[in-house]
Structures are given as C-alpha cells and as structure tokens.
Amino acid sequence: MKVVNSLLERCFQLIELLAEEPRAYRLGAISERLGLQKGAVHRLLTALCSMGWVEQDPETGFYRLTLRLAIMGQRVLLATRIPDLTRPILQKLADESQELVRMAIVEGERLSWVAFVQGRRTGLVYQPEMIGRVPLPVTANGKAWLSTLPLEEAMRIAREEGVPPPGRFGPRAIQSIEALAAALDETRARGWGMSYEEAERGIAAIAAPIRPAGPNTPAVATCSVAGPVMRFGADDIVRHASLVMQAANEIAAIWPLRSAQTESDLALASQLREELAVAAS
C-alpha cells in the first residue's frame, strides 16, 4: 500500500507541476523538478497520455496537460455555486474600480484563481494569463490570505513555497522571509494586502481576505483589484482598498457551504481515483 501511495503522490506531483504554467515541459525538466529518474517520469507520462490527462507536442516532444482536468475542476467549482453567487459582487467591484477584479480560493496550503471580471473597457487594459496557482509572497492576494493565518503557520507555508529568485517576478518583489513577515504585519493591521510592482513590472494590486466565519478566522478566499501603477496613486489606493474590503465582506456574507455530494459527484471522484491508480501501477 505504501508503494501505491508513493506512486500516486508522484502522479499528483507531476500533474501539479504541469498545471503551474500554461506551457509544455520537456521530459528532462520534469525529471529535474520532481527529483525523479527520467524512466519513472516517462512511465507516468505515458500512462497519463494514454488516459487523456496529458498530451505530447508532436513537434517538440514536450508534455502539457489536456483540458480534461480543467473541465473536471470546473464541474467541481460549479457544484459549489461559488461562481454564480459571487459574480454580481465581482461585477460591481469591477464597474466601480474600472480595473481587473479577480477572486482566488484557498485549497489546502495554496491559492488558486477561480474567477475574474474586467472593469476597464478603454485605454490601457491589464489582462494577464489566469494561471491556476497564485504566487503567495509577491501578490496582494497571497499576502491577504497569509495575514489571516497564525504567523508561524504563514511563515511555514511561505518557506515551503520559497522566496522567488530575483528577476522572476516584478522589480519590487519581496526577497526574504523577514521582509514578508513585516509585510504581513502591515497587511494584518490595515485589513488588506498590496502588491506594487512585485508580481509584475508596472502593475499594482490590492486584495482583501474573505472570512465567512468571522473577522478573526482564516480566510477561505480573497478578492482583488489590479491595474497599471499609473492608476494606483495614493487616493486611488485608499478608494480601491475600501471597495475591495466591502466586496470581500459581501462575499463572506453569502459564502456557500458545499452541499451534500450527489451520486454524480461520488461517481466522478471514484473514476478519478481508479484512473490515477492505473497510472501509478
């Protein structure tokens, strides 16, 4: 059983790696990132390709996820009714801020983007790729969530993710755990997180935690406003922060609890377990 569990863990690690960025990976890069032999990685990739979870680019030979996992995730997300219930609030925030509005949900010890609304119709429009996983130390959303956790837990999560190397994100990205701890103290004190040319050059963002269980509990999600730094002056920051916190409170008030699992939910979960077990065998 331990061997099977280990193989399943490797399978999930492989899937999570391929989901980090919207690009294809070469076999050697996957092997290096996972710390596994190329032969073991190739066997997993071959199994996942045969079941339709992964595909190999015919020209480069690189590997990437198919849309199958995204479709399954969307089905799970829709079952929570979160997109339907939060859409009007996110739309209102986008209309009032005239900037890009995004929402991310806490999944274990990470944040994942789940929704966005574009509030800017003309001029310079900020529209980044919606990569699933949110980088925690350099984003307003990441800091907004981490600030709601006990400091020791927040620092542990941050250390496990690691401080990004210089040049990977924006020019003002946090470069040490100590600097992140100070930023979380500021975020906790004012109730919202900020990123100013940290995630991307020329981009600023403000995010607030969504806390359905009360103001002193860990957030279950975050919502944010983001746009060019030229539209995030001192007065703009105050205004955006107020709008974002109001939206976060409104979402918290209607946050849906997951309803009882239906037969189709259980069948879907069973199918996934069976197919991953085959991939790991």
For each of these PLM feature ranges, what is it?
Residues A260-S281:
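Signal-transducing coiled-coil/dimerization helices and immediately adjacent hinge/linker segments
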Residues M1-D84, N249-L257, V278-A279:
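N-terminal helix-turn-helix
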Residues L17, R33, L85-E96, R102, ...:
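Amphipathic alpha-helical regulatory segments at dimerization interfaces
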Residues V4-L8, L27, F62, T66, ...:
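Short, structured helix-loop boundary elements
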Residues T60, R64-V163:
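Amphipathic alpha-helical effector-binding/dimerization core
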Residues R172-E250, A267:
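Extended hydrophobic
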Residues V54-Q56, M103-A104, I210:
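A structural signal for short hydrophobic beta-strand segments in well-ordered beta-sheet cores
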